[in-house]
Amino acid sequence: MPQHEFITRQLIDKGWSEDRKYCVTDEQGNKFLLRVSPIEQYDRKKSEYELMGQVAALGVPMCRPLEFGTFDEGVYSIQTWIDGIDAEENIHNLTNQEQYSYGFEAGKILKEIHKIPAPKEIEDWEIYFNRKADHKIKMYEECPVKYENGQAFIDYINAHRYLLSGRPRTYQHGDYHIGNMMIGNDKRLY
């Protein structure tokens, strides 16, 4: 990695992505998040890195992208490190009011992320989300486990599909959930 020399590298064994994640430390004791991906994912990871820069520019509390490139292990990105606790693993230790406050804050953060326009080449939302709804409904119908009055959910979705028509296209996070959030030592949600 051209711009950084790290003296420690500790694997972070969490999450579902193929990326290998590490907490790395430089000679001055500064910590960073290092993500390493297979070289075949270069284009996708470069797009993700650039998008992270757009999100960070909105003031969203997050690991800030610092460097992107390739090295002998694949594609890497270096981001700022956030000291704190895993939100998913610790939410149950918080009061109901604290949980509500963090949930409300998560909604405000997502609203900021949705200010980013979708790429021009992305297909129309109505087509995309109707196909996605069709797929999810089909999966539910083929699943042996059913919700009591589950058809009411399907009926609701089908009755409101018209709302997808003419919607503005914005960036969709796609993986925005408590498992990808931290509560910093400063008590902020990241």
Predicted segments, located by residue:
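An alpha-helical support segment within catalytic cores of ATP-dependent transferases
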Residues: 1-3, 115-174, 184-185
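Charge-rich, low-complexity amphipathic helices
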Residues: 77-78, 135-136, 179
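Conserved N-terminal boundary motif of the eukaryotic protein kinase catalytic domain
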Residues: 3-12
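Acidic active-site catalytic centers that drive phospho-/nucleotidyl reactions
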Residues: 48, 173-175, 180
